[in-house]
Amino acid sequence: MTLRTAATVAAMLCAALATHASAAPTGVAAIQARLTNPDGGIVVVAHRGCHAPAPEHGFKDSAPENSLAALERCIAIGADVMETDVRRAADGTLVMLHDATVDRTTDGTGKLSELTLTDLQKLRLRSDEGGAQAPLTDQRVVTLEQMLARSKGHILLNLDVKDAIYVQVVDAVARAGMQHQVIVKAEAGIATPPLAAMLPFDKVYFFPILINAHGTADLAAVATAQTRNAHPVAFELPKMTAAQLPALVAVSKAHNVRLMVNSLWEGFIAGYGGDADAERDPDKVWGRMHRDGISIIQTDAPEALLRYRASLEQR
């Protein structure tokens, strides 16, 4: 090989490497790539947003759940997904609120179904998970339209739709041009048709929530039924026993569908532990989940889970 030929080959190789590097997704595209790749590693879902303190990123105090402040914090710390709750107010406005009343999370009282957006805008959100003793903040009840606008291009949203308003919610998502930035989920039992192939769920990323009837359901059969002529992105696992997991993992691998679990509170898989256990020993809880086939984890401790994921990726 002549020097000129060698130089040409080297230049071509460098150009190819540069092209490959420049093609690597970044920002929300990287999150989308991670979510839709069953081998894409752990996906971090922040439950009701990043409302807990995140001292490693300069957030020493709590933020209200389901608030714009909780969303901004999720973006700042690098969470992949913010889970947030959607309900309909009396005037039809879609708003981000977990409970059917405003009592726990605001300085007001009453049923959301009896309050208009004008009523809601007068209320202040309470810090963190709320309650009568939680401090009031300057944050207000957020509309779905506001949540979509602020998250666009930055983070995925996992919408927990609390009322029978799926069509209205997905229509709002479509108007915002965010069909590939939003996850919607709905419960599925053994007799439920494959929801991911049905309107409006086929317009967004969709997760069936598997129903564990009486705690003894054949969850693998439920999951398999949801893959017939349909391709959900993930199955969300219910509260279940550890013995029910291996068959679900087999189904998920056979159909290239991820498994999502909550590590909230005591955790949703008996014997695996929850967030408090994971913050003490992340490998024992989150690591075990990941090794056993679960790759999407919803948590109230997103900063700690992100730290643990980073440690895995550095190994």
Map each language-model feature to its residues:
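Bacterial N-terminal signal peptides that target proteins for export
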Residues: 1-9
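Bacterial N-terminal signal peptides
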Residues: 9-18
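Phosphate-group recognition and catalysis centered on beta-loop-alpha active-site segments
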Residues: 23-315
